[in-house]
Each structure stands twice: as structure tokens, then as C-alpha cells.
Amino acid sequence: DKGDTKITTGTGFNIQTNIGNEMIIDENSLTSLAFTSDKQNIYALECLNSFAGGTISWLKNNLKLIDKPEDSEVLSKKEKDNNGVYLIPAFSGLGPPFWVSDARAAFFGISASTNTNHLVRAGLESVAYQMVVYLEFMKKSRNLNLKNLSVDGGMVKNKFFLQLISNLLEIELNIPEMEDMSSYGALLFGMQYYHNLKNTTDLNDFKVKNSKIIPNNDDSIRNSFSSWKEIVDKHFVKNQD
């Protein structure tokens, strides 16, 4: 349905939002063909970013702050907040909706009280912030109502990360039991093409069960997100002018 959105996480992340049968050209997204049949074409707005799990790998491999990716959740939960520390993960510039190609990654807010947990939490939060800031922008600029948000890929193992997204967007997340839904979807449509499935209704027989992440009232993370956006605007976006 229009407004249905899927976030795929891996080294980077991909966000696709169903925009219905009207093709839209948007400077902050790619427009792709999500589905086609004899009756209609369904289009999607798509956002690509090179760093999601890649940010966690950087914390592990380059900074040696964690021993394994799962530690990012464990250490983040040890602190009540990020202690005012923020990571702008512009390892290959800042993508949509900022578009600052020459931006470089940086920590902000480090003080004498900063510890490893704060740095790791700032890194993990920054991945969620990148996704949420894009979706918020698209909701506002395109008047899109996010009715159904699914997240799959390697980072769905991190429940702290998923809760951040759910809280910030104030929306329930659907987490499929199958981690790689992109490949599974390609398989289903391949089956349909070769007439093993007669129509889209038959696809319901192959639906994957979902778990849910429910938003909770957490004003602190919204305040943190606002501070992150202010840093991006002050030190990266306005510097382009």
C-alpha cells in the first residue's frame, strides 16, 4: 500500500517507500519501479546510504571500542544517555536530505567524563538518526503517511537500535523472522512469473511472521535527536553557504 516503507540494513542501509502508481521525481531520493503487472506500475522512493553496520564495524575494527557488533547494544544500555556525545557518521559525506559531499565524520561533545560506552552509544544512535531524519523529511516534503514500517537485515538483532527508530518516528516496527527479505521477495516474484503462483493473493500463503517493536514515551532520545540535527545544521549544512 502507499506509504508502506522497508528499511534494509547491512553495511549500509536502503529505504524504500511505496508512493503508489504515480511516478515522482525527487531530488532527495531515487525513484524506482517497485512492482509491475499487466494492470499497473507501483513506484517507490529510495534512499541509499553507505554506512549503517559499517559504522559499528568502524567502532570495532578502527577504534577497538567493541569486540563484536553485539557489544554496541550491551554498552549502549549501560548508560542512561549519550552524555552529550554525538557522532556525525559522514565517512563518505552526508547523504539525503543534507547532501554535503565533502563532509567528514566527527565526534562532538567529548569531555573528561566521556567513556567508551558513550562513544559507542553515540555511534549506534547516529545510524538510527540518519534513517529517521530522511524519513521525517520525506513525510513532510511529500506528505507521506508511513502506515507500515518494516526493518530487516543484519542490524535487526540490535533491539536497542530498533527501539530508537520506533520511539523517534512514533510508529510500530515490523521485524520479519527472516533476516533477508529482499532476496525472499525476489524469490516469490520469480515464482509468480513462472506461474507457480497464479496471482498476488497467492503470495499471502508465503507471508513471513513478524515480531513487533512498540514505541514508548522517551523524551530524552527525541531531545538527543534534536541536538544531533542542530550539530549537522550548524557545522555541515550552513558551512556550505
Segments predicted by a language model, with ranges:
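Glycine/Thr-rich phosphate-binding loops that ligate phosphate moieties of nucleotide
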Residues: 17-241
